[in-house]
């Protein structure tokens, strides 16, 4: 069966926690200072990246999800840099600025791929008022499907219990990247993602997988969690849930250059995947694949939806089902570079029947890759009228993505896919029915780009409307 990535565009996630700015200074070093026995670095360039909870938000945005971040900052230049950088990535920033504190900033001096020193600019947030964060949560919770709390023990989650209770009262799952040995403060959270060291700091040394599972289950019961996901470095990760068998995943990392931010990526992909409708097991598999990618990058890193898809299915296998428009365009570019012919079609596909399957099989035979663009629910309602669609967008796309003939499934919200087709520009555009090529939405653009437009016949005797009427009439 062909695995399916979720539609991350449907994932709204609220992130609360320790936001920070990671700064990097890069340069060569070839001598020792005459002033002290330390290397001299000639700084040639620099870089600034959101870190901590801000890196979590950036990861979700990079996947195509909707990230809303709340955290404590100072009233200073690093706070402005964070806001500008994240806003440019479509992250909604809702920071609480405290004039008596600096924004947490970490400066790393790098040379020849190695970190020589890290300078931290910070004061722990203490005795802060929870009200500003709680009021921001009230505004955000109706628009999200998951909450992440990213704890680096810098004080932004001083009132974490109040935040957990508010989210859980709204029936929103809470995912926490913990810090320290006091798991009592996280009581009632949905899922924690401790690494092996953090886990052993709480339960003591673990000598076997069975002991890990037993101790994890004890924590789940003691602190009223739903699950623990223990990340285990070269041993992969293990999901432990109440009443479920443990779920072990081996590591997917090929090379490890830098683990900075890997935990951020794990919890980002995990929560975004659950918010997009995936089970815990499916979400963990995606998070494990994501971790294998980011540890192969230098510095605090994110990954795109296309990188995640390639990590899950192999760099040469792009048969990954449901995909965002942005990731689709990137995937099509790679397919063209491999000399593959890309075919595209579109439709509502409300109740998939034999006629649809026959049509899609025929379309797939015309090239190497088949894209199916699917009208969203709002688009179908405008085109088909009341009572349609019968099946919502995510279910229609999931069924299509499960067909062997289909490579990519992408939603569009307009009445026609003309704009989407003009962005993708497939080698061939296919449409079923009694059309002239020049009448097909997007056909002119495809032809102008050197592509081809084909009209295929539908199989007689197959109609979604007839199926609906038969069901209403109690037939069949």
Curated annotation (Swiss-Prot):
Annotated HAMAP family: HldE (MF_01603)
Known role: Catalyzes the ADP transfer from ATP to D-glycero-beta-D-manno-heptose 1-phosphate, yielding ADP-D-glycero-beta-D-manno-heptose.
Record family assignment: In the N-terminal section; belongs to the carbohydrate kinase PfkB family.
GO molecular function per UniProt: ATP binding; heptose 7-phosphate kinase activity; heptose-1-phosphate adenylyltransferase activity; phosphotransferase activity, alcohol group as acceptor
One Pfam family matching this protein: PfkB
Protein name (record): Bifunctional protein HldE
EC number(s) per entry: 2.7.1.167, 2.7.7.70
Region (Ribokinase): 1-318
Region Cytidylyltransferase, residue ranges: 344-476
Annotated binding of ATP, by residue: 195-198
Residues annotated as catalytic: 264
Keyword annotations from UniProtKB, A to Z: ATP-binding, Carbohydrate metabolism, Kinase, Lipopolysaccharide biosynthesis, Multifunctional enzyme, Nucleotide-binding, Nucleotidyltransferase, Transferase
PANTHER family reported in the protein's UniProt record: BIFUNCTIONAL PROTEIN HLDE
Subunit structure: Homodimer.
InterPro entries reported for this sequence: Bifunc_HldE, Carboh/pur_kinase_PfkB_CS, Cyt_trans-like, PfkB_dom, RfaE_dom_I, RfaE_dom_II, Ribokinase-like, Rossmann-like_a/b/a_fold
Gene Ontology biological process terms in this record: ADP-L-glycero-beta-D-manno-heptose biosynthetic process; lipopolysaccharide core region biosynthetic process
Gene Ontology, cellular component aspect: cytosol
